């Protein structure tokens, strides 16, 4: 349940950094100062993302009993989302420090922030279209009462609608990247898109952990049922 998704996202994780490095090498040749910042900056951001993911993961247990009620998590999903947001804030903060103090170009940090924000938006978007408490899933459940045909059609329509929202958010992020570097040439635009991708996947560790939560909890529940445990133990 976990290996397939982890392998796929790890491939994307590596492809984005490789594309950023290749395009950065091209920009070194184009840049009159031959600055290595185009190559080094993606590596630094990737390192910041890894550290932020680790720090965010350690914050998961605290949200259930967090002092501020409006930030307190009511279930495991909310706790994971909070930890993801902690990682995101940390990455954005340090990306601006690196972009301004090292690279001397705040737009690089903006690209990273757009990518990180894109990943953050995906969490509630995914939850909305897959949670049993939300209208899309309730609509599919309701359609099962009238037969298999309506169930299939309802499921397909909800799936397609969720894809449209995800694609819309991605397109908006690409447009912003184009506006930031569009006047400097095609190579700069491609590099900007690569940096958005690097920012989006900077917390891959959190993503894999969140994906693994489902199979692990499901298997634990199955073991509990076979052991004839009560629902209180399952919770």
Please report, for each region that a protein language model flagged, where it lies by residue.
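Hydrophobic packing and interface segments
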Residues: 2-235
């Amino acid at each position: 349940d976990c290996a397939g998704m982890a392998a796929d996202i790890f491939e994307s994780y590596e492809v984005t950094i490789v594309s950023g490095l290749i395009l950065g090498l091209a920009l070194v040749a184009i840049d009159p100062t031959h600055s290595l910042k185009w190559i080094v900056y993606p590596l630094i951001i990737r390192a910041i993302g890894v550290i932020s993911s680790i720090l965010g993961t350690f914050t998961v247990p605290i949200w259930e009993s967090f002092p501020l009620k409006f930030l307190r998590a009511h279930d495991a999903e909310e706790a994971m989302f909070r930890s993801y947001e902690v990682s995101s804030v940390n990455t954005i903060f340090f990306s601006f420090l690196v972009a301004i103090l090292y690279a001397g170009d705040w737009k690089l940090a903006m690209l990273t922030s757009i990518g990180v924000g894109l990943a953050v938006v995906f969490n509630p978007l995914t939850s909305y279209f897959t949670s049993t408490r939300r209208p899309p899933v309730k609509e599919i459940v309701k359609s099962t009462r009238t037969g298999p045909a309506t169930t299939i059609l309802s499921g397909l329509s909800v799936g397609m609608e969720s894809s449209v929202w995800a694609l819309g958010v991605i397109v908006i992020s690409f447009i912003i990247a184009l506006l930031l570097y569009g006047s400097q040439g095609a190579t700069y635009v491609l590099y900007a898109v690569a940096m958005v991708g690097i920012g989006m996947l900077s917390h891959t560790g959190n993503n894999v952990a969140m994906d693994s939560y489902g199979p692990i909890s499901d298997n634990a529940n199955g073991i509990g049922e076979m052991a004839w445990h009560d629902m209180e133990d399952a919770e």
